[in-house]
Amino acid sequence: MSTDKTQVKLRFFTREEDETLHVNDAPIYAPVSLKRYGLSEIVNHLLELPKSMPFDFLIDGELLRTSLQDYLIKKGLSSETFLNVEYTRAVLPPSYLSSFDNEDWVSSLDVGSNYIYSGSYDGIVRTYNLSGKVEKQYSGHSGPIRAVHYISSTRLVSAGNDRTLRLWKTKNDDLKSIDEEEIEDGKTLAILEGHKAPVVSIDVSKDRILSASCDNTVSLWSTNYKEMTVIDPMEDLGGNVSTAAKKRRKLTLKDGSIRRRAPLALFESHSAPVEAVIFDKSDDTVGYSVSQDHTIKTWDLITAKCVDTKTTSYSLLSVAQLPKLNLLACGSSARHITLHDPRVNSSSKITQQQLVGHKNFVVALDTCPENEYMICSASHDGTVKVWDVRSNTAMYTITREDKNVVKGVNDKVFAVKWAKGVGIISGGQDKKIQINKGDNIFSN
């Protein structure tokens, strides 16, 4: 295989839903010297599109980043090999858009109602408008915040190292039927207590909240405090204490006047800290958690039972669901992302695929709102990577834009969110909320 005249037999196919992008699947011969651009020209010719469209190509699930000849050599294949070549619309690089300042490390991010919500190590939740202005701050946690999640235009939930979750009131609209009394905007509706160690992850589905903690447990809560059991902060004093002593205790107790609530259910099965938890996107009676005990657990949230455990070889630190593909993506302490089929009756093959490229812990994941095959990941190596899960290597790597970032000193990324209408939002040790392009990602 030496000359440019050498050809290889191949068949093009696509999984694009748009049928105008489907070619006839008859085999053709193409020069082995072709790279992505040349293959794109062939597909455009076959499609007879009015306007040329760039494509990416995958062979056996691997994105083609070289010539066909280099691919064949790398795989030890001859030019006699028949190649099935998948093509997809090319994805644009996630170009840098802007950065917002935060007062401390950014541990968590969410988006809702055209606002960005950040949880910070200074214990404050902040609401940013899309221009980067801080519109509101929520203070109450007594330690670093580890997770924040938008619930609705009137509700927000956060969790942190102080072992609690807090339900926040963001504004007064339509709340009179829910709340017993008017509470000022930006104030705590309820403190949710029950965990015995830092609460590091939360997810929300409709009126339910899941939390994961370093106490090895997962808890289920309601977004409406009336549904949860009241906790009396005086209860642990016992019945033989004078009224005066109780009054003194209440005065010294931080936030003593704020209502406190217990979880609807507590899930115990993990044997090490639980690092992340999510609801199933198509069935909110099912939850998934990942832990430093190397396992992925599936929970029946109705019966509070663990219905499936999948054991991997590494501590798991983050999780995201790709529902159309029946896959969970899990970030690990071993620097890679593993893909798993969470279904109880799925194949005995625990790990379906590994995505390799990060150089440190993979601590946050999110899915692309435009494409069921794409995810982004945040790592302590200082990068966010964009992946097509049909390939085991990253499509793009996003680095920190702040010039004050020193590699290995203050470049860890702790949080990433891929939000339609906003982009790929990330934050970490550099105290910046960085936004990269994440909308209209396909070339036209």
From Swiss-Prot:
Q: Which domain of life is it from?
A: Eukaryota
The record's family statement is: Belongs to the WD repeat WDR12/YTM1 family.
Q: Which organism is it from?
A: Kluyveromyces lactis (strain ATCC 8585 / CBS 2359 / DSM 70799 / NBRC 1267 / NRRL Y-1140 / WM37) (Yeast)
Name of the featured protein: Ribosome biogenesis protein YTM1
Instruction: Provide the function of this protein.
Output: Component of the NOP7 complex, which is required for maturation of the 25S and 5.8S ribosomal RNAs and formation of the 60S ribosome.
Question: What is one GO biological process annotated to this record?
Answer: maturation of 5.8S rRNA from tricistronic rRNA transcript (SSU-rRNA, 5.8S rRNA, LSU-rRNA)
Subunit structure as annotated in this protein's UniProt entry: Component of the NOP7 complex, composed of ERB1, NOP7 and YTM1. The complex is held together by ERB1, which interacts with NOP7 via its N-terminal domain and with YTM1 via a high-affinity interaction between the seven-bladed beta-propeller domains of the 2 proteins. The NOP7 complex associates with the 66S pre-ribosome. Interacts (via UBL domain) with MDN1 (via VWFA/MIDAS domain).
Which key words are in the record? Nucleus, Repeat, Ribosome biogenesis, rRNA processing, WD repeat
Report the gene name: YTM1
